[in-house]
Amino acid sequence: MSHQRPEIFDNFAGAQVMTVDGEPQRDLNQARRIVLEMKEPLCRIPEDLRSLLSVTISVYCIETPSALVSTIIKNMPPEASIALVTGCRFLAVRDGPRGKTVTVLSTAFLSGLDESVTQQLFIHADTLLLTPEARSRISLLQDIIEDPPTSFETVGHIAHYNLREAHLPYRYFIGAVTCEKEPAITTVITKIDTVQSQYRTYNFELIGGVPRYDVKLVQDGITYSFNYTKVYWNSRLSHEHLSLAQHINQTICPNDLVLDGTCGIGPHALLLAKRFNFTNLICNDLNPDAYKSLKMNVRINKAENAITCFNEDVSSLLRRLLPETNLKAVIFSLPELSINLLQAMKGVPDIYCFLECFTRAPPHLAYYDLLLRCSESLLDTKVCTGIQQALSDIEKVAENKELIDLLIACYETFEVKEIRTVSTNKFMYRVTLKINEQKETVKVLKK
């Protein structure tokens, strides 16, 4: 038997609600003045801001016997993301973009309720006060900042923002809101310069929470422990860490000797050891703090039998290892220097090299740019002027089929894969190459 909805639902199905404007507690100019006067990192929104950031909205609500609340909640549509149960009153509203209407009690929701339930409902208009506790992080930021930052990198309990210049006057408000609205976050920082140091660390400012920088996190089944201020770590590269480990596993054998020459705290080697059962790994990093964390992570993950750790210049280490070992693969994951580090591999054939590197060439020329620059390092031949060369030069070389064929002949394998866009006109790629005997090719190139 079909059920018909009571006529009262026709008045409220798909109802729209708007923020109530003109209320004294919504003096956002006063709120901005308080925000701009904030002078230190906080763990929550200051008390004198809380009432100014509360908003009253008009809603339609359902009044129903308490016994039916669970039934109604089960049928609640996705748009009703804020659900409050107070006594026998059920309020549902979706918080939407500022100044726009939002849907409450969609037709689909009302139609999905059994008639025995709908007959016991009473729907009426009401108002609902949303305090900062009930509002989202982004909606709070939008009240104060015209174009607020919406995303950050999460590193354990640390939220890492890259704030633009226009956001800096609001940084302590951003930090306080992030700490309060993100339960897992207790420390909020913003980077204040680019990665320029020898060890790829950078300067930052604490803008929210407490200055606690020792991190412990689990990623793809591997536990990492490190001090975020002293080593390089980018959570956005987690997919690439696993992808590279999978690629290496598909390329060589688990008992082959592999050197991770710029390993940081060890993500590639630890994944190879624990996920793919590699047994003969050498890890090296020049940063003493990264080396300390690397040894700790090897111990935490019980990989001591598979990984040997070094703390020295990778070129010196290679000069020692190449004549003494049967090295099968090398990983260079320091993008600014990876291609330069290939110089240590000159004249060494039949070893796979896995590089992470940058290019400013557009996607259709990236392969040729990376081929030219890798060849310059490996062949000791100045074919072109490198990463700062004019794109027109790369285009000319890309059109020179004879030269490209000569370069490709130097390699048994030369593959490139885009990893991510770092910034405008700056891209990160993975290069996989294996060197052939090169003597004849070098002679031709030097003519």
From Swiss-Prot:
This is tRNA (guanine(37)-N(1))-methyltransferase. PANTHER family: TRNA (GUANINE(37)-N1)-METHYLTRANSFERASE (PTHR23245:SF36), TRNA METHYLTRANSFERASE (PTHR23245). It comes from the Eukaryota. Signal peptide: none annotated. Monomer. Specifically methylates the N1 position of guanosine-37 in various cytoplasmic and mitochondrial tRNAs. Methylation is not dependent on the nature of the nucleoside 5' of the target nucleoside. This is the first step in the biosynthesis of wybutosine (yW), a modified base adjacent to the anticodon of tRNAs and required for accurate decoding. S-adenosyl-L-methionine binds at H241, D285, L286, D313, V314. Pfam families: TRM5-TYW2_MTfase (PF02475), TYW2_N_2 (PF25133). GO terms for cellular component: mitochondrial matrix; nucleus. One of its GO terms (biological process) is tRNA methylation. It catalyses: guanosine(37) in tRNA + S-adenosyl-L-methionine = N(1)-methylguanosine(37) in tRNA + S-adenosyl-L-homocysteine + H(+). Belongs to the class I-like SAM-binding methyltransferase superfamily. TRM5/TYW2 family. The keyword DNA damage does not apply. GO terms for molecular function: tRNA (guanine(37)-N1)-methyltransferase activity. Its main location: mitochondrion. It is found in: Mitochondrion matrix; Nucleus; Cytoplasm. Its EC number is 2.1.1.228.
